[in-house]
A protein has these predicted regions:
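Internal alpha-helical scaffold of NAD(P)-dependent oxidoreductase catalytic cores
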Residues: 113, 147-154, 172-266
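Rossmann-like NAD(P)(H) cofactor-binding subdomain of soluble oxidoreductases
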Residues: 74, 78-172, 188
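NAD(P)+-binding Rossmann beta1-loop-alpha1 motif at the extreme N-terminus of oxidoreductases
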Residues: 16-71, 76-83, 109, 130
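NAD(P)-dependent Rossmann-like dehydrogenase/reductase catalytic/cofactor-binding core
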Residues: 72, 215, 222-230, 237, ...
Length: 364
């Protein structure tokens, strides 16, 4: 068995090529999906966005993403954005690997050039709020854009508790693919599922996309308690009561938000809570939450983490804005969302951390 970078060369789980999969966006999650995709015997291409130029140059030189500690499986091709057309030639599946900051760019520059018979799977997590207090999924936004062009695509998404570096490490991972057509989802699952990447499939797009987006503010909330305890007791003493107390309240509020979205099923809640857990303990949102809990305001925390993408803050702000509109309408009650509203005050009004513990109690 040959060695590369100190690691065994992969023996593919399927001996014959199955499909051509092109990943557009060389961010960490999109790039991590190249591992199960290639290990299943597919031809895999990664096309960087205009912001990924240095990443692609590094991949071409070293066959490794600069944020990963492991080489890509052999046989992956890398392209700069100018070669997008070449990267899409003969493609069977496209994976959208942009962050929520790239939603408009992806809709304007990538979706229009994908052949209509090619399904798309996106890793982009988030929701967009409207002036009347609705929360829309990114696939819904992209569909509206495509409709205005007279084009149709099969738009699917992946959600669930999965960090990119742990996927690269082949930690056992449970995710859900969602889309409008179950047969298409079965096809995508066949291309991507491995003995460590386990895929559920569902046509409840609103449910999965909402569950994995709604967790953002709550992951920040749990991380606040970590920072507060580090400030009060030092970094060496672990405290879990406060984390667990806020986590439990987060579960309640996420369930109410899923009800608001018409998607309060046990499966959707499980995907969202799992994603909340991994984000608290392995995500970038944890870092900003700890800094806020230690006493920094939001601007100071952002400055401390300069260069770290914090899309979770934007998504949390959008969700809170929609909820406040519905509270004003009388559709929702403020007392049902003490964590979300406090997080919104911290992000938007630079309010100091003052977790409303008494608001979490109940009498039955």
């Amino acid at each position: 068995m040959s060695l590369r970078g100190g690691l065994p060369k992969f023996i593919f789980q399927r001996s014959m090529k199955m499909a051509v999969i092109t990943i557009v966006g060389a961010g960490m999650m999109g790039s991590a999906l190249a591992f199960p995709a290639r290990e299943n015997g597919n031809e895999v291409r990664i096309v960087g966005t205009h912001l990924d130029r240095e990443i692609i140059e590094g991949c071409l030189a070293n066959n490794r993403h600069p944020k990963f500690d492991r080489d890509f499986p052999e046989g992956i091709s890398f392209y700069q954005i100018e070669d997008l057309e070449k990267g899409l030639d003969g493609v069977d599946m496209v994976i959208g690997g942009v962050s929520s900051f790239g939603v408009d760019w992806f809709g304007d520059n990538v979706l229009p050039v994908i052949p209509e018979n090619v399904p798309v799977l996106t890793v982009t997590k988030g929701l967009m709020d409207t002036e009347d207090g609705k929360l829309l999924t990114y696939p819904d936004l992209w569909k509206k854009k495509l409709d205005s062009m007279g084009k149709k695509l099969s738009l699917n998404a992946v959600g669930g508790p999965c960090t990119s570096y742990e996927l690269v490490a082949h930690d056992q991972t449970q995710v859900a693919f969602c889309g409008d057509d179950l047969e298409t989802l079965k096809y995508l699952k066949k291309l991507m599922e491995t003995d460590y990447y386990h895929v559920s499939i569902t046509t409840d797009v609103v449910g999965i996309e909402s569950a994995v987006a709604l967790k953002n503010g709550y992951a920040l909330g749990v991380a606040l308690t970590i920072g507060v305890n580090q400030k009060n007791f030092g970094d060496d003493t672990l405290h879990f009561n406060s984390q667990a107390g806020l986590f439990g309240q987060a579960l309640k509020e996420m369930y109410r938000l899923l009800e608001f979205q018409g998607a309060a099923t046990l499966d959707n809640l499980g995907v969202g809570i799992g994603d909340l857990y991994v984000t608290v303990y392995g995500g970038r949102t944890r870092l900003v939450g700890i800094l806020l809990g230690k006493g920094l305001n939001i601007d100071e925390a952002k400055a401390e983490l300069q260069g770290v993408t914090l899309e979770s803050l934007v998504v949390a702000e959008r969700v809170a804005r929609a909820i406040r509109i519905n509270i004003e309408k009388g559709t929702l009650k403020a007392e049902d969302f003490p964590v979300l509203l406090h997080i919104d005050d911290i992000i938007c009004k630079k309010a100091p951390v003052d977790i409303p513990w008494d608001a979490f109690t109940f009498v039955k």
